[in-house]
Amino acid sequence: MRVKTGVVRRRRHKKILKLARGFYSGRRKHFRKAKEQLERSMCYAFRDRKQKKRDFRRLWITRINAACKMNGVSYSRFIHALKLANIELDRKTLADMAMNDINAFNAVLASVKNKLK
């Protein structure tokens, strides 16, 4: 007896089409187009999860650099002075301080000023 793929195919298609919700036009409605677009989308999602970490680090460095420049210190010299002073604040915290609590950032900067040459 020949086995038909009715239930299996429907489940497989339903799974793909469920993941394709929110896509535009036929990429949402037609199985083959949805499958192709989903494959691309998953690749972009995988790549951009890695890229997001790099982007945020660049943003934090830019913000810290801007706050340092207001006090006449370069970013690289500030980070070097932090290492010499054994202050273990990460860039995310420093950037948040530079944006939201400039007085605290200036206090950290003042505490490492003597390490700068």
From Swiss-Prot:
GO biological process: ribosomal large subunit assembly; translation
InterPro entries: Ribosomal_bL20, RIBOSOMAL_L20_CS, Ribosomal_protein_bL20_C
GO molecular function list: rRNA binding; structural constituent of ribosome
Recorded GO CC terms: ribonucleoprotein complex; ribosome
Domain of life: Bacteria
Keywords annotated in UniProt: Ribonucleoprotein, Ribosomal protein, RNA-binding, rRNA-binding
SUPFAM superfamilies associated with the record: Ribosomal protein L20
Role played: Binds directly to 23S ribosomal RNA and is necessary for the in vitro assembly process of the 50S ribosomal subunit. It is not involved in the protein synthesizing functions of that subunit.
Family to which the UniProt record says this protein belongs: Belongs to the bacterial ribosomal protein bL20 family.
Name of the protein: Large ribosomal subunit protein bL20
